[in-house]
Amino acid sequence: MRIDRRAALTAVALLSAVSLAACGGSPSRSSTGASSDDAASGAVGGEITVFAAASLQKAYEEISTSFQEANPGSSVTFDFQGSQDLVSNLAEGSTADVLATADTRTMDDAAGGGLVGEQREFATNVLSIIVPEGNPAGITGFDESLNAEGVNLVICDDQAGVPCGTATREMEEATGVTLHPASEETKVSSVQEKVESGEADAGIVYATNAASAKGTEEITIPDHGIVNHYPIATTASASNPAGGRAFVDFVLSDKGREILAKYGFGAPSDSSAAPTSAAAPAEEATENG
Protein backbone atom coordinates (compact mmCIF):
# COMPACT_ATOMS: atom_id res chain seq x y z
CA MET A 1 0.00 0.00 0.00
CA ARG A 2 1.28 3.45 -0.87
CA ILE A 3 2.33 5.78 1.94
CA ASP A 4 1.10 9.39 1.96
CA ARG A 5 4.31 11.44 2.04
CA ARG A 6 2.63 14.80 2.68
CA ALA A 7 2.44 14.37 6.44
CA ALA A 8 6.14 13.50 6.63
CA LEU A 9 7.04 16.37 4.31
CA THR A 10 5.06 18.85 6.39
CA ALA A 11 6.68 17.66 9.61
CA VAL A 12 10.17 18.14 8.18
CA ALA A 13 9.19 21.53 6.78
CA LEU A 14 7.89 22.68 10.15
CA LEU A 15 11.14 21.65 11.83
CA SER A 16 13.02 23.68 9.23
CA ALA A 17 10.84 26.67 10.07
CA VAL A 18 12.47 26.90 13.51
CA SER A 19 15.87 27.70 12.01
CA LEU A 20 14.33 29.94 9.37
CA ALA A 21 12.06 31.94 11.68
CA ALA A 22 14.30 34.99 11.36
CA CYS A 23 13.24 35.26 7.75
CA GLY A 24 10.04 36.98 8.89
CA GLY A 25 6.30 37.12 8.21
CA SER A 26 3.80 34.98 6.43
CA PRO A 27 4.18 34.73 2.67
CA SER A 28 1.23 35.58 0.44
CA ARG A 29 0.24 34.46 -3.02
CA SER A 30 -0.06 36.86 -5.93
CA SER A 31 -0.45 36.53 -9.68
CA THR A 32 0.66 40.07 -10.40
CA GLY A 33 3.88 41.02 -12.10
CA ALA A 34 7.00 42.07 -10.22
CA SER A 35 6.64 44.92 -7.74
CA SER A 36 8.72 48.07 -7.96
CA ASP A 37 10.67 46.87 -4.91
CA ASP A 38 11.62 43.66 -6.73
CA ALA A 39 12.24 45.11 -10.17
CA ALA A 40 15.83 44.64 -11.25
CA SER A 41 17.71 47.86 -11.89
CA GLY A 42 20.23 46.20 -14.17
CA ALA A 43 21.94 42.98 -15.04
CA VAL A 44 22.48 40.42 -12.31
CA GLY A 45 25.29 37.93 -12.00
CA GLY A 46 26.34 34.74 -10.32
CA GLU A 47 24.87 31.26 -10.22
CA ILE A 48 21.11 30.99 -9.71
CA THR A 49 19.71 27.64 -8.63
CA VAL A 50 16.10 26.96 -9.57
CA PHE A 51 14.02 24.07 -8.24
CA ALA A 52 11.19 23.60 -10.74
CA ALA A 53 8.39 21.13 -11.39
CA ALA A 54 9.22 18.54 -14.04
CA SER A 55 6.43 19.81 -16.31
CA LEU A 56 8.27 23.14 -16.63
CA GLN A 57 11.50 21.75 -18.04
CA LYS A 58 11.28 22.70 -21.71
CA ALA A 59 9.75 26.12 -21.08
CA TYR A 60 12.16 26.99 -18.29
CA GLU A 61 15.20 25.95 -20.29
CA GLU A 62 14.19 28.43 -22.98
CA ILE A 63 13.40 31.09 -20.38
CA SER A 64 16.86 30.49 -18.91
CA THR A 65 18.50 31.05 -22.29
CA SER A 66 16.72 34.39 -22.73
CA PHE A 67 17.42 35.38 -19.13
CA GLN A 68 21.14 34.67 -19.47
CA GLU A 69 21.29 36.63 -22.73
CA ALA A 70 19.86 39.61 -20.85
CA ASN A 71 22.19 38.98 -17.90
CA PRO A 72 25.53 37.77 -19.33
CA GLY A 73 27.14 37.41 -15.91
CA SER A 74 24.52 34.95 -14.71
CA SER A 75 24.33 31.16 -14.83
CA VAL A 76 21.09 29.27 -14.17
CA THR A 77 21.16 25.71 -12.80
CA PHE A 78 17.96 23.67 -12.66
CA ASP A 79 16.70 20.74 -10.64
CA PHE A 80 13.54 19.40 -12.31
CA GLN A 81 11.59 16.94 -10.17
CA GLY A 82 8.12 16.31 -8.86
CA SER A 83 7.02 19.37 -6.88
CA GLN A 84 6.60 17.36 -3.68
CA ASP A 85 10.20 16.09 -3.91
CA LEU A 86 11.54 19.61 -4.43
CA VAL A 87 9.79 20.86 -1.30
CA SER A 88 10.98 17.83 0.64
CA ASN A 89 14.57 18.46 -0.48
CA LEU A 90 14.37 22.10 0.62
CA ALA A 91 12.97 21.05 3.98
CA GLU A 92 15.84 18.59 4.41
CA GLY A 93 18.47 21.26 3.81
CA SER A 94 19.03 21.51 0.05
CA THR A 95 19.60 25.06 -1.12
CA ALA A 96 18.02 26.88 -4.04
CA ASP A 97 17.28 30.47 -4.94
CA VAL A 98 13.89 29.88 -6.59
CA LEU A 99 11.09 27.33 -6.21
CA ALA A 100 8.41 26.85 -8.89
CA THR A 101 5.76 24.19 -8.30
CA ALA A 102 2.94 22.69 -10.34
CA ASP A 103 0.25 23.50 -7.80
CA THR A 104 -0.44 25.78 -4.88
CA ARG A 105 -0.73 22.94 -2.37
CA THR A 106 2.94 21.99 -2.53
CA MET A 107 4.00 25.65 -2.45
CA ASP A 108 1.78 26.13 0.60
CA ASP A 109 3.62 23.22 2.24
CA ALA A 110 6.88 25.08 1.61
CA ALA A 111 5.41 28.33 2.91
CA GLY A 112 4.13 26.60 6.03
CA GLY A 113 7.69 25.51 6.78
CA GLY A 114 9.10 28.99 6.27
CA LEU A 115 11.00 27.81 3.19
CA VAL A 116 9.84 30.47 0.70
CA GLY A 117 8.85 34.11 0.47
CA GLU A 118 5.96 35.68 -1.44
CA GLN A 119 4.24 33.40 -3.94
CA ARG A 120 3.28 34.62 -7.40
CA GLU A 121 1.16 32.66 -9.81
CA PHE A 122 2.72 32.62 -13.28
CA ALA A 123 0.90 29.94 -15.30
CA THR A 124 -1.90 27.39 -15.41
CA ASN A 125 -2.17 23.87 -16.83
CA VAL A 126 -4.85 21.22 -17.40
CA LEU A 127 -4.87 17.45 -17.82
CA SER A 128 -4.84 15.54 -21.08
CA ILE A 129 -4.36 11.95 -22.25
CA ILE A 130 -1.54 10.73 -24.47
CA VAL A 131 -1.47 7.42 -26.32
CA PRO A 132 1.03 5.89 -28.76
CA GLU A 133 0.54 6.83 -32.42
CA GLY A 134 -2.43 5.00 -33.88
CA ASN A 135 -4.03 4.64 -30.44
CA PRO A 136 -3.74 0.82 -30.48
CA ALA A 137 -5.71 0.40 -27.24
CA GLY A 138 -8.66 2.39 -28.59
CA ILE A 139 -8.78 4.96 -25.81
CA THR A 140 -11.77 7.28 -26.26
CA GLY A 141 -11.39 9.72 -23.37
CA PHE A 142 -11.37 9.93 -19.60
CA ASP A 143 -13.77 7.01 -19.40
CA GLU A 144 -13.93 3.25 -18.90
CA SER A 145 -11.82 2.68 -22.03
CA LEU A 146 -8.85 3.46 -19.76
CA ASN A 147 -9.82 0.46 -17.60
CA ALA A 148 -10.38 -1.98 -20.46
CA GLU A 149 -8.76 -5.39 -20.19
CA GLY A 150 -5.13 -5.35 -21.29
CA VAL A 151 -4.77 -1.55 -21.20
CA ASN A 152 -1.53 -0.48 -19.55
CA LEU A 153 -2.44 2.87 -18.01
CA VAL A 154 0.12 5.09 -16.27
CA ILE A 155 -0.76 8.07 -14.08
CA CYS A 156 0.90 10.28 -11.46
CA ASP A 157 0.88 9.21 -7.83
CA ASP A 158 -1.63 11.19 -5.78
CA GLN A 159 -0.65 9.56 -2.49
CA ALA A 160 2.94 10.73 -2.97
CA GLY A 161 1.64 14.30 -3.30
CA VAL A 162 2.41 14.65 -7.03
CA PRO A 163 0.35 17.61 -8.34
CA CYS A 164 -0.70 15.87 -11.56
CA GLY A 165 -1.75 12.91 -9.41
CA THR A 166 -3.92 15.16 -7.28
CA ALA A 167 -5.50 16.62 -10.41
CA THR A 168 -6.10 13.10 -11.76
CA ARG A 169 -7.87 12.08 -8.55
CA GLU A 170 -10.03 15.21 -8.77
CA MET A 171 -10.85 14.30 -12.37
CA GLU A 172 -11.91 10.83 -11.23
CA GLU A 173 -14.24 12.42 -8.71
CA ALA A 174 -15.65 14.85 -11.29
CA THR A 175 -16.30 12.17 -13.92
CA GLY A 176 -17.22 9.25 -11.69
CA VAL A 177 -14.53 7.12 -13.35
CA THR A 178 -12.20 5.26 -10.98
CA LEU A 179 -8.95 4.42 -12.74
CA HIS A 180 -7.00 1.20 -12.30
CA PRO A 181 -3.47 2.11 -13.43
CA ALA A 182 -0.66 -0.34 -14.01
CA SER A 183 1.77 2.10 -12.39
CA GLU A 184 1.83 5.47 -10.66
CA GLU A 185 4.81 7.77 -11.12
CA THR A 186 6.34 10.45 -8.91
CA LYS A 187 6.69 12.96 -11.74
CA VAL A 188 4.66 13.65 -14.85
CA SER A 189 7.67 13.38 -17.17
CA SER A 190 7.97 9.69 -16.22
CA VAL A 191 4.38 9.12 -17.35
CA GLN A 192 5.17 10.83 -20.65
CA GLU A 193 8.32 8.76 -21.15
CA LYS A 194 6.49 5.46 -20.62
CA VAL A 195 3.95 6.31 -23.31
CA GLU A 196 6.63 7.60 -25.69
CA SER A 197 8.60 4.35 -25.29
CA GLY A 198 5.52 2.19 -25.91
CA GLU A 199 5.67 0.76 -22.40
CA ALA A 200 2.22 2.20 -21.67
CA ASP A 201 -0.98 2.29 -23.73
CA ALA A 202 -2.14 5.56 -22.20
CA GLY A 203 -0.96 8.18 -19.75
CA ILE A 204 -2.65 11.02 -17.90
CA VAL A 205 -0.39 14.07 -18.23
CA TYR A 206 -0.64 17.82 -18.57
CA ALA A 207 -1.63 19.44 -21.84
CA THR A 208 1.91 20.83 -22.01
CA ASN A 209 3.35 17.31 -21.91
CA ALA A 210 0.95 16.23 -24.64
CA ALA A 211 2.14 19.11 -26.82
CA SER A 212 5.80 18.07 -26.54
CA ALA A 213 5.50 14.27 -26.43
CA LYS A 214 7.09 12.38 -29.34
CA GLY A 215 5.45 9.51 -31.20
CA THR A 216 2.14 10.00 -29.43
CA GLU A 217 -1.36 11.31 -30.00
CA GLU A 218 -3.33 13.54 -27.65
CA ILE A 219 -6.87 12.86 -26.51
CA THR A 220 -8.20 16.05 -24.97
CA ILE A 221 -10.62 15.93 -22.09
CA PRO A 222 -12.95 18.57 -20.61
CA ASP A 223 -11.18 20.20 -17.67
CA HIS A 224 -14.28 20.07 -15.40
CA GLY A 225 -12.86 23.12 -13.66
CA ILE A 226 -9.74 21.20 -12.65
CA VAL A 227 -6.88 23.60 -13.37
CA ASN A 228 -3.43 23.55 -11.82
CA HIS A 229 -2.13 26.97 -10.80
CA TYR A 230 1.67 27.29 -10.89
CA PRO A 231 3.27 29.54 -8.23
CA ILE A 232 6.87 30.74 -8.04
CA ALA A 233 8.81 32.18 -5.10
CA THR A 234 12.30 32.96 -3.92
CA THR A 235 13.52 30.76 -1.08
CA ALA A 236 14.63 31.50 2.46
CA SER A 237 17.85 29.56 1.82
CA ALA A 238 18.82 31.57 -1.27
CA SER A 239 22.55 32.09 -1.68
CA ASN A 240 21.88 34.55 -4.52
CA PRO A 241 18.65 36.31 -3.50
CA ALA A 242 19.11 39.15 -6.00
CA GLY A 243 19.56 36.65 -8.81
CA GLY A 244 16.56 34.67 -7.61
CA ARG A 245 14.36 37.76 -7.59
CA ALA A 246 15.56 38.70 -11.06
CA PHE A 247 14.72 35.23 -12.40
CA VAL A 248 11.25 35.37 -10.84
CA ASP A 249 10.69 38.79 -12.41
CA PHE A 250 11.78 37.44 -15.79
CA VAL A 251 9.33 34.52 -15.59
CA LEU A 252 6.56 37.03 -14.83
CA SER A 253 7.61 39.38 -17.64
CA ASP A 254 6.10 39.66 -21.11
CA LYS A 255 8.97 37.57 -22.49
CA GLY A 256 8.55 34.90 -19.84
CA ARG A 257 4.83 34.61 -20.44
CA GLU A 258 5.38 34.50 -24.19
CA ILE A 259 7.70 31.50 -23.79
CA LEU A 260 5.33 29.75 -21.38
CA ALA A 261 2.44 30.22 -23.83
CA LYS A 262 4.59 28.77 -26.61
CA TYR A 263 4.82 25.53 -24.62
CA GLY A 264 1.08 25.38 -23.95
CA PHE A 265 0.81 26.94 -20.50
CA GLY A 266 -2.22 29.06 -19.76
CA ALA A 267 -2.10 32.56 -18.33
CA PRO A 268 -2.32 33.10 -14.57
CA SER A 269 -5.86 33.08 -13.20
CA ASP A 270 -5.72 36.83 -12.62
CA SER A 271 -5.27 37.60 -16.30
CA SER A 272 -5.98 41.30 -15.71
CA ALA A 273 -2.68 41.65 -13.88
CA ALA A 274 -0.20 43.36 -16.16
CA PRO A 275 3.10 41.52 -16.60
CA THR A 276 6.36 43.35 -16.21
CA SER A 277 8.87 44.00 -18.92
CA ALA A 278 11.99 41.85 -18.75
CA ALA A 279 14.82 43.83 -17.25
CA ALA A 280 17.57 44.81 -19.67
CA PRO A 281 21.24 44.81 -18.68
CA ALA A 282 22.50 48.06 -17.24
CA GLU A 283 25.25 48.53 -19.80
CA GLU A 284 24.56 46.87 -23.11
CA ALA A 285 21.24 45.39 -24.23
CA THR A 286 21.38 42.21 -26.26
CA GLU A 287 19.49 41.81 -29.49
CA ASN A 288 17.67 38.71 -28.37
CA GLY A 289 16.90 39.82 -24.78
Please identify what each model-predicted range represents.
Residues V18-A22:
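C-terminal motif of bacterial Sec signal peptides marking the signal peptidase cleavage site
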Residues Q119-L127:
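Short, glycine-/small- and polar/acidic-enriched structural segments
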Residues S83-L115, A211:
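Pocket-flanking alpha-helical
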Residues M1-V12:
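Bacterial N-terminal signal peptides that target proteins for export
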